[in-house]
Amino acid sequence: MKKIAILALALVLALVPTLTLADETVRLGVTGAFYEDLWQPAIDKLAEEGIKVELVQFSDFSLPNNALNGGELEVNAFQHHAYFNNDTTTNGYDLQVLADTFVITMNLYSAKYPTVEELQAKVAAGEAVNVVIPNDATNQGRALLVLKDAGIIDLTDDYEGTPNTENVVQVEGGKVELTPVNAAQTYQFLEDSDAAVINGNYAASYGVDPASAIFQENVDLSDERFICLIAVRTADIDNPTYQRVAEVFRSDVTTQVVKEKFDGFFYLTWDNE
């Protein structure tokens, strides 16, 4: 009888994680319509396990961390480490990184110049050039690095983390004017500028082909700054449901949809672990 009781208890304990994960709704904050396609395979798989994931769309990068910190979300997945570190420190949010996900490219696009060499030639000729960049600190810094690598501007080397506009130096003869706008609006200024540096999530949301970029960002997965992440409140870092959400997303179901719909936009961290 004692042996039966022990076996019964062991069976109950084995079922506890499954019961804990069942019938829960996880509100997940994102920025951009493409996340609906990106997350759908994981959402479907999680639903089979009794975990309902509800995507909550935000129109601006400044909102999802505030919503997560305030309890309006359980999880968010929209930002890279550089943004997360700056935003949580600046605003005193009590958030933690649950898992790394991918690097989403930030590329240089132009509606006027089919190649970066043609844009470089205009800069070298001393003609006025207007380039649109994001206006938030971390995405702007990343955009400036893209422009430097593309040969459109130069930068001083006395910055920490990512540069800002004070670090911008004109290349010889250059007259490049930078126009900072909300990151979500960079694509909308493409037709009215010489070029624009556009976050991949917004480019994907507008159906932009990443191959149409006149310069593609040099992606380094050993550099944590621009690796995107899934975040939770610090108190929830060990929550098995949220850990399971991250685990399923970081799996073959997402790899497949990236290959089918978003090839060229994402570099998946779990492919290199």
Task: Identify the residue ranges that each predicted region occupies.
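Ligand-binding "clamshell"
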Residues: 86-98, 111-117, 190-192, 197, ...
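Periplasmic-binding protein-like
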Residues: 139-148, 249-270
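Pocket-flanking alpha-helical
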Residues: 61-92, 203-207
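Short, polar/charged alpha-helical segment
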Residues: 25, 32-57, 63, 67
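A conserved helix-loop-strand patch within extracytoplasmic ligand-binding domains
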Residues: 94, 98-153, 255
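A bilobed periplasmic-binding-protein/Venus flytrap-type ligand-binding module shared by bacterial periplasmic
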Residues: 105-118, 226-244
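Short helix-initiation/N-cap motifs at beta->coil->alpha
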Residues: 55-66, 159-188
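Alpha-to-beta junction loops
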Residues: 69-79, 129, 174-177, 191-198
